[in-house]
């Protein structure tokens, strides 16, 4: 087999591939063995029709497509290895010649991984993040704990305020007509949560138990129910009960209920401070890592093929679909609720997809430029770490991974980011 690579404009080129006649004939033979198993001919058992009779009745050309399906993937794979190129999309194949006892000649128009011209990636100036924890930070965290342990109690006197929960009946009307899904009874609405459409909750504020009111709102233009989107509506609302949060007292008893590992409020505050310090340090490290990677990516020159962005978009949509399934939802339901579709979703994700592809290409280029390698011991240590994290045997982790090659590549990327951080200004 012979292969010749000719670079065209941008990241596109043409592979001209020639395969020996012997391999062509072998592929035709293999195609016959496959096809003949499906043919019933009177006088012969299924799959036992002689080759000469087959060619006489159907013509040898009837085998060519199956033969091509056999020979093309192998020939194309060997050709890209020989040419030393890295395709990022399916090729456009053009068969110039295919027949028995003759060399196969075909071309493959290929989009390849782009060349990355690295810019500055050492000595990058990154902003130092403040990691000091103040007394105010601790008090705010304590207040959040207090809020989470608050109990809802009935407010006997007074009106609905922001932060209260109002138990209401409601029924919505558009153009004087009730609409599907617009009615509820004894619904607990947390005021200020933004659960209902904009403007609704604010108009419930100030009502007393037993009072009713017509709430005038407009559905958002992007509302998931197209027949309601952008339309004004009137909701008849009656407040049955008002509940307010009753905060527990901040004392040693509260501290023990919040965290059984502490005995006093002071111990709880000290633990909260330690947790906040660790959290801020972790957050600062992540921010620096993200920043150096983004700076290095921005400094590089790359002509990214659209095919790579499309592939990344498909991957992102699959990831999004998996997250939805964990919440008991699927893409079709999501499209209905949000009034969007597959094209709009991809358009929303496109900028992030471009960013991901650029960053991945730049990190790969840095790995190559700095000869970053990963040892077998480092891969083994990572597998053991994963086993401990998931509470699984090491062998089970290895079996789940199948191959550790992808893990080794991930570790190289991590090392590349470490390199950028260590060499930042």
Curated annotation (Swiss-Prot):
GO terms for molecular function: peptidyl-prolyl cis-trans isomerase activity; protein folding chaperone; ribosome binding. It is an enzyme of class 5 (isomerase). Keywords: Cell cycle, Cell division, Chaperone, Cytoplasm, Isomerase, Rotamase. GO terms for cellular component: cytoplasm. It is found in: Cytoplasm. Its main location: cytoplasm. It comes from the Bacteria. The keyword Cell division applies. It catalyses: [protein]-peptidylproline (omega=180) = [protein]-peptidylproline (omega=0). GO terms for biological process: 'de novo' cotranslational protein folding; cell division; chaperone-mediated protein folding; protein transport; protein unfolding. PANTHER family: TRIGGER FACTOR CHAPERONE AND PEPTIDYL-PROLYL CIS/TRANS ISOMERASE (PTHR30560), TRIGGER FACTOR-LIKE PROTEIN TIG, CHLOROPLASTIC (PTHR30560:SF3). Involved in protein export. Acts as a chaperone by maintaining the newly synthesized protein in an open conformation. Functions as a peptidyl-prolyl cis-trans isomerase. Belongs to the FKBP-type PPIase family. Tig subfamily. This is Trigger factor. It comes from Bacillus anthracis.
